[in-house]
């Protein structure tokens, strides 16, 4: 189930913590010719005995003229170490971007080391937040200052 693979990655991702996309989004992607799915499976003999044979990785990519954008990835983590399914799905994305003649491939913001090995360049990440009520932030800041003062006056951690 491709949606289950997506949710595996989504559940473990804390760099960008968002809500789960509804199943309908994936259905809509499937109807739009600008969206592509790359599905990675193993040869039959590679599946462990008793394990259901199915996709071990998927990527949902968007083709916008000269730009290829892998937007979402899904993984079966049981195959991450043994078959390096994340590395393989990234390589398949690079191959597909070349096949469609994409001039630019936007890989996303996580797993920088793996993507650099495929020739990606990392750019600094910046985010801005507008806070309507800063009470909690100010409280945390006061706690940090108090903790720092305790360390400085005692000569060690509080």
Describe each model-derived feature in a short phrase.
Residues 24, 36, 44-46, 52, ...:
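Glutamate identity and glutamate-enriched acidic tracts
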Residues 18, 41, 95, 104, ...:
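Residue-identity detector for threonine
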Residues 1-9, 24, 91, 95, ...:
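Long hydrophobic alpha-helices with heptad-repeat/coiled-coil character
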Residues 1-81:
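A conserved beta-strand-loop-helix scaffold within acyl/acetyltransferase catalytic domains
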Residues 109-158:
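Terminal substrate-recognition subdomain of acyl/acetyltransferases
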Residues 65-129:
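Acyl-donor binding region in acyl/amide transferases
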Residues 8, 17, 28-30, 85, ...:
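Detector for Asparagine
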